[in-house]
Amino acid sequence: MRILISNDDGATAPGLAALYAALEDYAECVVVAPDQDKSGASSSLTLDRPLHPKVLANGFISVNGTPTDCVHLAINSLLDHEPDLVVSGINLGANLGDDVLYSGTVAAALEGRFLGRTAFAFSFASRQLDNLPTAAYFARKLVEAHATLDLPPRTVLNVNIPNLPLDHIRGIQLTRLGHRARAAAPLKVVDPRGKEGYWIAAAGDAEDGGEGTDFHAVMQGYVSITPLQFDRTFSDAFSGLDGWLEGLR
């Protein structure tokens, strides 16, 4: 088995190293990841300059681009054989609810959809490293079990692991995406030369975080697995739009 591993925290991120270490004796793993932190890059592609892959001392390949660039380039140019699986992470910080719209971790997994196979996006609900081995354990466990999955093509499994020791994890739950409240306003700052700028503020708190959501599962000590699809068509809106268009013809 061949696994393509990527992330959005960058090629030197501890979560990426932990994921590789968890999988390297299970499959032939190739790591292609951004050369710097690209959190929040979503599914953006770099179109204004060429991409330059660089092989690092540990064998990982870094690219001066986004997570989507990395997977796109790896599948279409860098690899001699297509991978059997695309795995992204381990992100330091959860990707819950609306986070998936912005997450480079999820985007890297989504780019693997062209293979027509299931892909995984793994996120750990902390930026502290003490319990990162818990996330690595579940990444290995779920990847090992993926061969028995019977899912529609191009399914992405968004996995969030609580910041807990392994023996404190209560189990695994299948969840839906929750929703966040509106984020705080960007923070206005002034640099030493008097030039004004803005920092994007933290994401909003969970607004829809009840039972059954990814928010609730992680808060209750469960690993959350949410199946995602690329098709964002809002089918329920068709009937209302049909009537609206009739009046415009």
UniProtKB/Swiss-Prot annotation:
Its EC number is 3.1.3.5. A divalent metal cation binds at residues 8-9, 39, 91. Its main location: cytoplasm. Binds 1 divalent metal cation per subunit. One of its GO terms (cellular component) is cytoplasm. Pfam families: SurE (PF01975). Transmembrane segments: none annotated. It is an enzyme of class 3 (hydrolase). Its cofactor is a divalent metal cation. It comes from Pseudomonas fluorescens (strain SBW25). This is 5'-nucleotidase SurE. Nucleotidase that shows phosphatase activity on nucleoside 5'-monophosphates.
